Amino acid sequence: MTTIVCVRKDGKVAIGGDGQATLGNSVEKGTVRKVRRTYKGKVVTGFAGSTADAFILLELFEKKLELHQGHLVKSAVELAKEWRTERSLRRLEAMMIVADETDFLLISGSGDVIEPEFDVLAIGSGGNYAKSAALALLRTENNLTAVEIVKEALTVAGDIDIYTNHNHIIEEI
């Protein structure tokens, strides 16, 4: 698994993820890029779960973005519908967080599209650790940026979760 976390603060959105890929009980690679920009650099995606499945979903999401001219919510809902109804896609084991400058969403394999109640979303095996750390930092008085909060949340997750490392990729919109 992995950890992907997304934070909105002061009008900025940051998504970050670690770089660890595991196969069974062993680390296969520590520098996988699970966070990437798409749609003319205006949308950032982060994925957790099976890497091959995530790439299939990312490709489908990019097609939806093109079809709907970058409209994040519409593209996410259409992807979730297809994921839920298309028999071959139902077996894919991955989750995604997608964000643009105004919205960010979690897209799950069961067809859920979730907008966060708070300004944090996190997925993957270390997701709950990262979400807790990010929420705590958002609720305290500090001068941390969204990027700094994501970095700290990923560090906490990496300290606790054996499937999350400290090689972070963070993108900000």
From Swiss-Prot:
Q: Which Pfam families match?
A: Proteasome
Q: Where is the active site?
A: 2
| Residues bound to Na(+) | 158, 161, 164
Purpose of the protein: Protease subunit of a proteasome-like degradation complex believed to be a general protein degrading machinery.
The family note in this entry says: Belongs to the peptidase T1B family. HslV subfamily.
Encoding gene (name) = hslV
For this protein, what is the EC number? Answer: 3.4.25.2
What keyword terms does UniProt attach to this protein? Allosteric enzyme, Cytoplasm, Hydrolase, Metal-binding, Protease, Sodium, Threonine protease
Q: Which InterPro entries match?
A: ATP-dep_Prtase_HsIV_su, Ntn_hydrolases_N, Proteasome_sua/b, Proteasome_suB-type
- GO CC annotation terms, alphabetical: HslUV protease complex; proteasome core complex
Q: How does it assemble?
A: A double ring-shaped homohexamer of HslV is capped on each side by a ring-shaped HslU homohexamer. The assembly of the HslU/HslV complex is dependent on binding of ATP.
Q: What class of enzyme is it?
A: hydrolase
Organism superkingdom: Bacteria
Q: What is this protein called?
A: ATP-dependent protease subunit HslV
GO molecular function term, any single one: metal ion binding
Q: Note the SUPFAM superfamilies from the entry.
A: N-terminal nucleophile aminohydrolases (Ntn hydrolases)
The reaction(s) this protein catalyses: ATP-dependent cleavage of peptide bonds with broad specificity
Any one of the GO BP annotations: proteolysis involved in protein catabolic process
Instruction: Please verify whether the record's keywords include Metal-binding.
Output: yes
How does its record describe regulation of its activity? Allosterically activated by HslU binding.
According to its UniProt record, where is this protein located?
Answer: Cytoplasm
Protease as a keyword of this entry, yes or no, is: yes
